[in-house]
Amino acid sequence: MSILDVENLSVSFTEYTKGFRREKRTYISSLDLSVKAGEVVAVVGASGSGKSLLAHAILGILPKNATVGGTIKYNGEILTSSRQKTIRGTEIALIPQSVNFLDPLMKVGKQVQPPVQSGDAKTKQRKVFERYQLKNEVEKMYPFQLSGGMARRVLLSTATVSGAKLIIADEPTPGMDKAVLLEALNSIRELADSGCGVMLITHDIDSALTIADKIAVFYAGTNVETSPAEHFSGNGEKLRHPYSKELWRALPQNDFVGIEGVQPLVSQLPLGCLFEPRCKMATEECKKERPKMRSLRDGMVRCIHAT
């Protein structure tokens, strides 16, 4: 059974437009995704495709002007707002984008301890520090005294000290040098190998492929494909969706050919397939309605032409 099931998720915001008129705009639509215990599912896509919004919806930390549709299930039970609040930080934990998440005025040991709900918090904090090769004296340091790698390990400690079963890593590796990057990725893989379900949100497909079991490709507020990681290989012939193939071929080690056009703005989404205006395979049929996600060759795809 999946530890996380997202079914037909939509996220909309009520916003003020010109003339102080209120308008409801949908940023995520018809999104389906699952994460099993022991696996890393990497969520990749361009900025503005809805990756971080998905994380915030799962955690229940969207702003008050947000409206959420569809269902999110954790261990088979629907995540209501009250349940999200209860298990956030304990059973479901976030590894945030930036080390700026750490309070600059508080010693890091104290920052790691709050998620602990049973047993001695300091003992558990020291145990998780040992796991990530942080000495006891680190607990008395302030964030500015840490190296980049140490700060990342403190964030990992905060996310795992409570024994969380679902870890959401939101762009956890930006700006890292190669050594620190590999260390961070290995730590995330170890979480899955210990039985956690991990959702890794990233722009970096290459890094994701080193640890992910599956890759979910996002475009304009929904996922267009979920594929076994090993299908991202060669010329992308094993991939299903045209956008996934274009994304793969645009990498420097492949054809390094950019994708023509841009991802549409929320206010300018096409009525049919969201990728249709940029797709070389598009037909008139693609303009009529949004394709549904369907199973295909050990993966999932949202395209009527995929075979």
Where are the predicted features?
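A short, proline-enriched helix->beta-strand linker immediately N-terminal to the Walker B motif
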Residues: 161-165
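Conserved ABC transporter NBD signature motif
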Residues: 67-78
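Conserved ABC ATPase signature
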Residues: 142-146, 150
